Amino acid sequence: MAKANTYDDSSIQILHGLEAVRKRPGMYIGSTDIHGLNQLVYEIVDNSVDEAMAGFGKEIDVTIHKDNSVTVRDFGRGMPTGMHKSGKPTIEVILTVLHAGGKFTEQNYKTSGGLHGVGSSVVNALSSYMKVRVVRDGKAYEEEFKNGGHPVGTLKCVGKTKDKTGTTITFKPDQTIFSTTKYKYETIQERIRESAFLLKGVKFVLTDEREPEHHDVFQYDDGIKSFVSYLNEGKGTISDVFYFEGKQDGMEIEFAGQYSDGYSENLVSFVNNVRTGDGGTHESGARSGFTRAFNEYAKKQGLLGKKDKNIDGSDYREGLSAVLSVKIPEELLEFEGQTKGKLGTPQARSAVDSLVYEKMSYYLMENGELAQELVKKAQRARDAREAAKKARDESRNGKKRRKKEVLSGKLTPAQSRNPKKNELFLVEGDSAGGSAKQGRDRRFQAILPLRGKVLNTQKAKLQDIFKNEEINTMIYTIGAGVGTEFNVDDSNYDKVIIMTDADDDGAHIQILLLTFFYRYMRPMIEKGKVYIALPPLYRLQKGRGKKSKIQYAWTDEELAEDEKKMGRGYSLQRFKGLGEMNAEQLWQTTMDPESRMLIRVKIDDAALAERRVTTLMGDKVAARRKWIEENVKFRMGEDGSILESEDE
C-alpha cells in the first residue's frame, strides 16, 4: 500500500542564504536554459553600466574564457571594502545576501538597472566559482566563492596597486543547474553592443578566448542615433535619423527614429539601459504622442478630407525604426516581473507622450516636404490595413464560398476542431504532401502542401501578398488575420510546422516562410507556435523482416556512431528529399509527437532578428553573401549542399 503524503509542521522548510535561488533559479533569472545563462552575464554587466551611468568609469571589459567562465571589469569606484554593520565584509554581503546593495536610494545611483540587491548575489548562487577583485584607495582586495556562493576564506587586501579603481568579477556557471553552459558569442555581442549605443561615449571591449577567437570594441559618440542607423543597415531609407531628448516629470527621455521604404515598424525600448522587450507605459506614451503629432499636422495642412477614413497610429509608423530610452528615478520605477521585461510606471506614459508629441510636431513643421510624403505613405498603409482586415474577416466568418474556393483541393484538414491541439504542416511539394497526408494522425494534424512559389514578403506590399496564392492560402488556413489585424488567439492551430527538404532549396523555402511569419504573423513566433521539422538524412537497415534493425541518423556525426553500432552487412539510404520517404517512415521520424525532432522558432533579440531578416531577404546581395560566408558552412552531399550553422 502506498504511503500517504503527510502535511504537518515538519513539512515546512526554511531556505537560508542563497539556497532559495538554487532551489528555484527560474524565479530570479527566468529559466535555466541559454536565456538564463546569458542573464548571468547581463546582471554583472548591468552593475558596471550603472557605475558608468552615474559618471564613474568610461570603459567596461567583458571576457569569455575557454572554460566558459566570464570576467567583467569596470573602472568605476569599486565596491566598498570595509566591514558592514552585520559583521561581515561589505563585499561579501553584496555577493551573498539577497536584497543587499546600494541602489535602494538616490544617494549612490539616481537611476539604475539590474535586479536591485539581487543580481550579483544571484549570479554567485548559480555559479560553481566566483572571484571578485576590487581596486579602491590605492589598494587591491580579493575574495573567492565556491559551490553556490560559499566564501573561501574571507576578503583579503593583497597589497598596494597603481591600477585604476574599479571592480572585476569572474564567475563560472554551475553545470548542475544549467542545461548548457556554452555561451553563444553573437548573442552576448549584440547585448554588449546595445549597452554601448545607450551609454554614449563609453567604451565596451568584448573578448572571446574560445575557438574561434573574437575581439570587438564598441563605442558610439552619437548614442541611440547610431543605434537606429545600425537597425536600418541594408534598408532603403527615406529620411535622416531624427533625435529628440529632454526631461519630463523627473525622467530623462531620448527618442531616435528613421523611416525606410519597408512596411513594418521596429521600436526597441529601454528603461535605465535595460531592454524592455515586452514594452510598457513608456512605449504606449511614445506611440500616442507620435500619432497625435501626425494627426494634428495632417489636419492643419488639409491632407485629410472630411470623408477621409481615420489613419491609425500603426499606419504612421509603417517603415519606422526607432529607439526609445528612458531614465527613471528609483522612487518612480515599477516593472512587471523580476527580469524587467515590461515597464509599469504610470507617469512614464504621460511624460513620454508629452515630449514626443512636442518634438515630433516641431520636426514635421520644419520638414514639410518629408512630412507630407509620410502622411501619404500612412494613407497607403491604412488602405492595406483595411484590406488585411477584410481578409481576416473572410478567413474567420464571412464569405464562406470565397474561403472554400481558396482552400479547395489544397488543405487536408484535421478531424478535430480544437485549436489548442491541432497542428498544421506546411509541406514542400506535392509528393511529400501525399506521404504526409497518408502518414499523419488525422485526428489533429492538417496538411497544406506548398506547390507554387512562396513570395518574398520582405519586399512585397500587403496588397501584393494577398495576390500570392501560397501566402493567401496560409492566411485563410490559419484563420487569424494578417499584419496589424492578426490575432494569435484566433489561430486554428497550436503549432505550425514547416517541413521541407534538407537541401538549399528547402532552406530557402524555410527562410521565405519565416520572413512571412516574422513580418505579418509575428505573435505566432513570440508565442512559440512556429516550428521547423527535422527529417532524417539517413536510414540504416540490417537484416530483413521482423528481425531487421532500422536506425535513422540526422547528422553525419550520428551516422558515424550508428555505423559503428550496426557493424557489417547493413544497407544505407540517403534521403534526397521528403518525397523519398513513405508514409510510415515520415510519420515515425518527422511527424509522430513521441519520436520527432522539432526546432521551435524564437525571437531572442528583436533588433538582431530585424537585421537578419533584412540581410537574408533584402536587396543588398553583398551583405547577404558576407553574412553567409562568415556564419554558414556548406557541406556537400549527393544532392548538393546542406546549410549548417557554425554556432549550433
Predicted regions and their residues:
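Short conserved segment of the HATPase_c
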Residues: 81-101
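GHKL-family ATPase ATP-binding module
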Residues: 1-11, 18, 40-42, 50-52, ...
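Surface-exposed acidic, glycine/proline-enriched linker/cap segments
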Residues: 94, 100-106, 286, 464-479
